Amino acid sequence: MATQKRALSESTTVLWNDMEMILMDAHEFYRDVAERAMLSKGEAADLTRAVLEALAMRVSAGEVRHLIRALPEELVDSVRWNSRGPKRFDLDDLIQSVSARTGLNKTETRTGVEAVLSTLREAVNRREFNDFLSQLPAEFTELLPSP
């Protein structure tokens, strides 16, 4: 069955894929990240954008396009790919980059990256998330608790 996406409003997306429906808007995404990482909603929004932007540079352009189709509209601007191909970096590089951009310390940033990945897993269909995650080093996968 092909994936179908229908916008209910500017920030809410419903995605059907193999009978799976996911409904999450950007505000819910930020709220979930804030709760998981124990941050303010504003900090969670900044963190989410920084993490998604960095991770999008780490995966193929095709995977970024697939992820964009599955995200709430307000998060799409954070997800752009590197026209020169995926950029290689490890988890420590990601944490350092996001920490510098958000002003969070490295412990808060690591917890925040975990929160963004966990929330992303809930916000997009399982297949899309697994395809995205498969292009990241194993150390990124280890951040996620078992579903």
Question: What are these regions, as identified by a protein language model?
Answer:
Residues 13, 24-39, 89-104:
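Short, flexible domain-boundary/linker segments around small modular repeats
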Residues 74-127:
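Short, solvent-exposed interaction modules
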Residues 37-86:
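Acidic (E/D-rich), amphipathic helical modules within compact regulatory domains
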Residues 18, 36-42, 50-56, 98-107, ...:
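Short, recurring structural edge motifs at helix starts
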Residues 112, 118-147:
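Preference for long, well-ordered alpha-helical segments
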Residues 28, 46-50, 66, 70, ...:
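Amphipathic alpha-helical interaction segments
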Residues 1-35, 146-147:
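Intrinsic N-terminal pre-sequences and regulatory tails
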Residues 34-37, 59-60, 102, 129-132:
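Hydrophobic/basic alpha-helical segments enriched in Actinobacteria
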